[in-house]
Amino acid sequence: MGNVFDYEDIQLIPAKCIVNSRSECDTTVTLGKHKFKLPVVPANMQTIIDERIATYLAENNYFYIMHRFQPEKRISFIRDMQSRGLIASISVGVKEDEYEFVQQLAAEHLTPEYITIDIAHGHSNAVINMIQHIKKHLPESFVIAGNVGTPEAVRELENAGADATKVGIGPGKVCITKIKTGFGTGGWQLAALRWCAKAASKPIIADGGIRTNGDVAKSIRFGATMVMIGSLFAGHEESPGETIEKDGKLYKEYFGSASEFQKGEKKNVEGKKMFVEHKGSLEDTLIEMEQDLQSSISYAGGTKLDSIRTVDYVVVKNSIFNGDKVY
């Protein structure tokens, strides 16, 4: 599989700029039948997204994926979003009642535009069976399947009918899969993305390990169509979860999707809880991401996201931060 590296080991090399202002650069991306303002999607986690944020994102042309931790609310959520002319994008698991849920959607003629099959180890017969089940009953839904970390997994899920695959096993900030199990793409997520993208014939969503806005551009360079981000989206005014004050500073809770806080029990725990500094409004963060990505495109010598895909890069093994951690 060649060179192993992660986000902080890579620098992209500038090409001649062809724009007068970064505002001429277009950050939009198409996934399935819809076009979105940014190639970025907040993680489908309980401390990152709720109905209110999903609505805000959809109304403003950002992609979103609703989490699956209140399964009984999904049908009303789909109805509500579609009645307002917005896309419905939901998550499902692979347990037996999820099969019934998909059939119920079909029976009620409810077709979410996007369905994400979301389990920790997505290279499994359970996921393959669920992809086929959704494609049989809801053929118009765009199916994202994951999470995976190998080219074999990408190929198998695509062959089963997945419209996109989500790549990343445990690189997230509140994910401790790497510590608890010894497995995953933590520490080499960017190389894993590159490896998987070479095998893919359909879009890839890079999931986890993003610590700076520049990492979004690096993900695009190594084959991602969309980039899923947790920690950078945690801690906003609008974010779910409680706000606490400590030493005069405001913090918000952020926990992983397989943490005991989310599961309500200490069994098969692969997530942890942390408090992140309060970041102000979500809108400001999205605008900053867009502006930074416009700058990335201008450094890549183009006007569209695709220009980033062909730039040269170097592996800087001493880390680009030289010990100065920015996160």
Curated annotation (Swiss-Prot):
What this protein is called in its record is GMP reductase
| Top-level lineage group | Bacteria
EC number, UniProt record: 1.7.1.7
The organism named in the record is Bacillus anthracis
What InterPro entries would the database entry show?
A: Aldolase_TIM, Dihydroorotate_DH_CS, GMP_reductase, GuaC_type_2, IMP_DH/GMP_Rdtase_CS, IMP_DH_GMPRt
Give the family this protein belongs to, as stated in its UniProt record. Answer: Belongs to the IMPDH/GMPR family. GuaC type 2 subfamily.
Primary role: Catalyzes the irreversible NADPH-dependent deamination of GMP to IMP. It functions in the conversion of nucleobase, nucleoside and nucleotide derivatives of G to A nucleotides, and in maintaining the intracellular balance of A and G nucleotides.
Q: Which GO terms describe its molecular function?
A: GMP reductase activity; oxidoreductase activity, acting on the CH-CH group of donors
Gene Ontology CC: one annotated term:
GMP reductase complex
Q: Which reaction does it catalyse?
A: IMP + NH4(+) + NADP(+) = GMP + NADPH + 2 H(+)
